[in-house]
Amino acid sequence: MSATDPTVVLGTIGSDAHAVGITLLDHALREAGFTVHNLGAQTAKTEFATAAADHDADAVLVSSLYGHAQQDCAGLHDQLAAAGVDATTVVGGNLAVGQTDFETVKQRFEEMGFDRVFSAQTGFEAVVDAVKTELDVDERSPTTTTLGA
């Protein structure tokens, strides 16, 4: 990868221990030409902010599947700003317990400052394409992911 590849920081926030989704998204982003810093599961907001600053991230992608993303993400944008990070922010997963109306959940996260909000049903390619759009990245390679090859 070249030094000009867009850089993303990726992780599962708070006490959420789900890591399979971010691992698959990591692969899809790398195949699409991104430099990825995967923080893994159970990542604190301060770790996202520090990593984004340290790696001069173009985007910060936050995953949460256990339904408590609103509580876990509260204050994330303040911490990013305090660290001098001006990056696109994306959140996705099962963001709210008993989530039935995704549009309401999406609006809540947009009001928190997220540039893109995705449900757990969103495919990895759609997320990669949205990040490319947000960062105005030219097509570099297909965004399909082949596992086990």
UniProtKB/Swiss-Prot annotation:
Segments forming domain B12-binding: 5-138
SUPFAM superfamilies for the chain: Cobalamin (vitamin B12)-binding domain (SSF52242)
Keyword presence, Metal-binding: yes
Enzymatic reactions: (2S,3S)-3-methyl-L-aspartate = L-glutamate
MF GO annotations: cobalamin binding; metal ion binding; methylaspartate mutase activity
Enzyme Commission no: 5.4.99.1
This protein's pathway: Amino-acid degradation; L-glutamate degradation via mesaconate pathway; acetate and pyruvate from L-glutamate: step 1/4
Domain of life: Archaea
Record-linked HAMAP family: Me_Asp_mutase_S
Family: Belongs to the methylaspartate mutase GlmS subunit family.
Name by which UniProt lists this protein: Glutamate mutase sigma subunit
Protein source organism: Halobacterium salinarum (strain ATCC 700922 / JCM 11081 / NRC-1) (Halobacterium halobium)
Taxonomic classification: Archaea, Methanobacteriati, Methanobacteriota, Stenosarchaea group, Halobacteria
Gene that this polypeptide is encoded by: glmS
